Amino acid sequence: MITRRDLLKTFCALPFIACLPRPVNAQNIVDFPQLKTGYAQRLKKILAAGELPYIDIESSCNSMKADIDSIAKSMDRLNIGLMALSADIGKGQFEKGVRFDNLSEKLLVSYPDRFIPVGNGGQPPVLTEAPDAFLDAQEVAARKKQMMLLGEFEFRHYPSPRQVKRGDTGRDVRVPIDGPTGHRVFSLSERTGMAFQIHYEIEDELLTPLEKMLEQYPKAKVIWCHLAQIRYIERASRYTPAYVDALIKRFPNLYFDTAFGDAASTYPPSNQRHARVWAAFGGLKSEWRDLIVAYPKRFLSALDLGQDRLERITEYDQKHRDFLKRLPTDIRHQVAYRSAWSLLFSEDFS
C-alpha cells in the first residue's frame, strides 16, 4: 500500500527529477556541450582511479537484439571510457523501410555519459540496394544534430573470419569509393564537418582511388579502420609504414583506427596472419610502433565489436589493452582517448 509518506517523498523528488540534464530534447536534437561535459567527467573519474580509459570509436550492433544494460555494465567493469556504438540496419528493418535507426537517441537517454551518438553502418543491404535513400536519411539526422559522427561505410569488405566459418558471403562488398556513393559520403563529411569511417581492404588496386578522393575532398574527415589489416599480402605490395607515413603527411584529415586481431589471428581463406603490426612472437613491429609514436594524434582506439561478438567484450578489451601497453605512456594516452576527443570536439582533452 502506498502511504502518505511515500506520496510526499515522490512529490518532493519531482523538482529534482525535472532538473536532471536531458542530452536529447523533444526535437531529438542532441545537446553536444552537455554530452561533452559528461564525457569529460567520466574519463577523468577513470583516470583518477589510476586506470586507463579509452574511446572505442568503432563498434556496432543490431539495435533489436543488443543488451545495452549489459554493455554499459561491461564498460564500467572494464574501464572503457566511451563507445561509438552504431546500429546496423539488417535485412528485416530494411524490408520494413528503415533507413535511419535512432539507437543513439535511446542510448543517450539511458547512458548519456558512455555512448557517442553515431550514424548507422553503411553496409548491405542499405548501402548496396538503397544507397541514396540511406544517405538521405543519414544526412537529415546529421543536420538535425542527432549524431556526432557518421558510421562505418563498407566500400570494400571481405567476409570476416567468423562469416567465413559460417558460410556467410553477404558481406563480400564492393562499392567503388570513387563512385556516386563514395562522392556523396565524402561530400557529406565536408559539409557537416563530421568524421566517417571506412572499411576498405588493403589492396594495391584500391589505393589510388582512395588517394584521389582524399585529394578531391580535403576537408572530409576519414577514419580508415583496421590499421595494417591485410588479408592477402600478395595483393598489397605498396602498403607499408612508409606508405602510411606519406599519406599522413599529404592528408591532414586522414586517421586510422587500431582495431585489428592479435598476433595469432589468421584469415581462413588466405591462411595468413592478417594483423601486420605484430611481429612473429607477439611484439609490435618497430616500424609500425615508430609510425604511431611519430603521429599519435592520427591513431584512434577501437574494438570493432559487432552483434555476433558483443559477449566477447572482455576478450576484445584485453587484446586492445595489450596493444596499448606496448606504446610509451604519453602516446598510449593519446591513442586511447585524446585523439578521438580532438577529432570529435576540435580541442585537446584537459
List each language-model region with its residue ranges.
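Alpha-helical scaffolding within the catalytic cores
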Residues: 38-42, 66-71, 97-106, 133-138, ...
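Catalytic pocket-lining loop regions of alpha/beta-barrel enzymes
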Residues: 30-36, 172-301
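Acidic-and-aromatic substrate-binding clefts and catalytic sites of carbohydrate-active enzymes
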Residues: 60-68, 89-100, 124-133, 199-208, ...
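Acidic (Asp/Glu)-rich catalytic clusters
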Residues: 46-48, 72-77, 102-113, 137-146, ...
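Short, well-ordered coil/turn segments that N-cap beta-strands
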Residues: 50-53, 79-82, 111-117, 146-149, ...
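Active-site gating/metal-coordination segments in enzymes
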Residues: 34, 42-47, 97-197
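Divalent metal-dependent hydrolysis catalytic cores, especially in the metallo-beta-lactamase
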Residues: 54-62, 66, 70-95, 114-123, ...
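Mid-to-C-terminal alpha-helical segments outside catalytic/metal-binding sites
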Residues: 2-17, 27-55, 69-93, 286-300, ...
